[in-house]
């Protein structure tokens, strides 16, 4: 086989400070790279689907807005004509009130559409989150963080008891494991003598949902 046709995989992690690179390290990096590529493809497909659904909802809302605007313009023209012909103040007030009711209804429909878009995005995010492998995501983040902290010396990993076997199988003696029964299964803390990094997939995801919902609440309190 010609060496010019061999497939190449670029590993972005820092190489170990050793003359000989162990095959286990290369295998781990290739596995993490494949998992990262698969996760990117899945998340890209989910986000693209969410964008398409959101764009359709927005187009429908804009179309309804245009139709309502045309109807309101037609009603307003009729109102002006009848006002000039009949000069009936009472009828004019009633018709104006009707237009105001239509405007309030339209405003309500737009608010409902915006709320529906938010809910759709939230449902897509929840579906994406449910499809994620907590173990693979945690191992990937730990490996990446360990590479960044490679110069820190001894590294200590605090984890939930359920993850002890997984971490020993994945990282061997790379970390000093400390079992924390109070941690959630998706929570971990990697530390050295100088600093520590803690992460929790569910906590970060819930923070994203909170930001999404708070953004909707703030817009709902603004004047239209």
UniProtKB/Swiss-Prot annotation:
Job description of the protein: Component of the type III secretion system (T3SS), also called injectisome, which is used to inject bacterial effector proteins into eukaryotic host cells. Acts as a regulator of the SsaN/SctN2 ATPase activity.
Gene Ontology CC: cytoplasm; host cell cytoplasm; host cell membrane
Alphabetical keyword list: Cytoplasm, Protein transport, Transport, Virulence
Top-level taxon of the source organism: Bacteria
Subunit structure: The core secretion machinery of the T3SS is composed of approximately 20 different proteins, including cytoplasmic components, a base, an export apparatus and a needle. This subunit is part of the cytosolic complex. Interacts directly with SsaN/SctN2 (T3SS-2 ATPase).
GO process annotations (BP): protein secretion by the type III secretion system
Major location (coarse): cytoplasm
Chain's gene name: sctL2
Biological source species: Salmonella typhimurium (strain LT2 / SGSC1412 / ATCC 700720)
Identification of the protein by name: SPI-2 type 3 secretion system stator protein
InterPro entries assigned: T3SS_SctL/SctL2
Family: Belongs to the SctL stator family.
Keyword Metal-binding: no
Subcellular location(s) of the protein: Cytoplasm
